[in-house]
């Protein structure tokens, strides 16, 4: 069946879309509230600016895309059939492309921010500030908008995918311009994701080096704890994003290098995975928030501390007994 111009949804239930919409909205709102509470307790930083932008972008994705799918199911029409000239399909495809690019770009900037804060602290303190974060986010949004309007100018195309409730860039474009455009999209995702992974690995290695050569146990431990609190959610979200975007990148390269035979099922799975990251991101921040990490850290270390205390008590008792016996022998 050709889903490109289908106007009525053949079958399906909106339960999955409704659950995804609810989880995305609730998760992002909860994460933003927790982030705001923490911001009021501590001085805001560049990292908080970037995290807020990431969560706001994910929330924007949930409220701008999911209601369109629910409306399509309610009307029994596909995205192409909901408007005369497929404007709804173009709107959906624009949002999917914009949100995937902007989210990944923000994640990459967050990874670079962590690397500079640990690897080059003097440069970080001297040249980077919250203002740099606001400017960077604005530039990311601007660049993504410019890229996403290219299909309206003849470079690439937003098309409908199975079962008629998804629209995205044409991953099997026959024209050279369309192939170059979608190839650039996939290559950009691959390069930025690789940069993010390299930065996170570099931060991890730097933290290990800091731990090994620390001079003051108290100050080094506190500094490392703060960095781990930032690194752990970022690394987890990076893994989630790789799992969600890599199948789409592979689908694009397969379509570019292989035949142009339509594989709707594989394309649909890749698109669904792409939409999951905006739902999972806020829950990662909620589960791995610093307060919960500190509680888990204390729970894990409490048995060790108890064992050490018992060992010290036993040694003290043995020493006192030995001293007492020695004094009696002397007398």
What is the role of each PLM region?
Residues 1, 37, 212-231, 291-331:
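Intrinsically disordered regulatory tails of 7TM GPCRs
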Residues 1-30, 34-37, 331:
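Extracellular N-terminal segment of 7TM GPCRs
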Residues 2-3, 76-93, 97, 146-191:
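Loop architecture of class A 7-transmembrane GPCRs
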Residues 9-18, 46-109, 117:
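Extracellular TM2-ECL1-early TM3 structural module of rhodopsin-like
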Residues 17-21, 34, 60-79, 100-106, ...:
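Helix-to-loop junction signature of class
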Residues 48-57, 205-248:
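Intracellular effector-coupling site of seven-transmembrane GPCRs
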Residues 71, 102-109, 116, 122-165, ...:
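Fourth transmembrane helix
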Residues 243-253, 266-312:
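Seventh transmembrane helix
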């Amino acid at each position: 069946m050709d889903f490109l111009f289908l106007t009525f949804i053949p079958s399906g239930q909106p339960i999955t879309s409704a659950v995804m919409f609810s989880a995305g909205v609730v998760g992002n709102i909860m994460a933003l509230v927790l982030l705001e509470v923490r911001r009021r307790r501590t001085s805001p930083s560049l990292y908080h600016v970037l995290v807020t932008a990431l969560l706001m972008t994910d929330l924007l994705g949930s409220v701008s895309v999911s209601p369109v799918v629910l409306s399509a199911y309610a009307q029994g029409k596909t995205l192409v059939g909901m408007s005369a000239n497929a404007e709804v399909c173009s709107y959906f495809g624009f949002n999917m492309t914009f949100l995937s690019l902007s989210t990944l770009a923000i994640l990459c900037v967050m990874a670079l921010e962590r690397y500079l804060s640990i690897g080059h602290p003097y440069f970080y303190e001297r040249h980077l500030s919250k203002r740099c974060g606001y400017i960077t986010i604005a530039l990311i949004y601007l660049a993504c908008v410019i890229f996403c309007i290219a299909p309206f100018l003849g470079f690439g195309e937003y098309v409908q995918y199975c079962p008629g409730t998804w629209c995205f860039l044409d991953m099997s474009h026959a024209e050279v311009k369309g192939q170059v455009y979608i190839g650039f999209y996939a290559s950009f995702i691959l390069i930025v994701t690789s940069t993010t992974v390299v930065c996170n690995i570099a931060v991890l290695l730097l933290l290990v080096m800091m731990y090994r050569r620390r001079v003051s146990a108290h100050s080094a431990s506190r500094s490392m704890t703060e960095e781990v609190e930032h690194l752990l959610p970022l690394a987890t979200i990076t893994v989630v994003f790789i799992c969600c975007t890599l199948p789409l990148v592979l689908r694009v390269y397969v379509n570019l290098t292989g035949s142009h035979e339509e594989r709707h099922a594989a394309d649909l799975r890749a698109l669904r995975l792409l939409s999951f990251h905006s739902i999972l991101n806020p829950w990662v921040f909620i589960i791995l928030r610093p307060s919960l990490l500190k509680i888990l850290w204390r729970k894990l270390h409490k048995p060790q501390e108890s064992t050490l205390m018992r060992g010290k008590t036993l040694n003290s008792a043995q020493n006192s007994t030995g001293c007492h016996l020695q004094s009696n022998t002397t007398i």
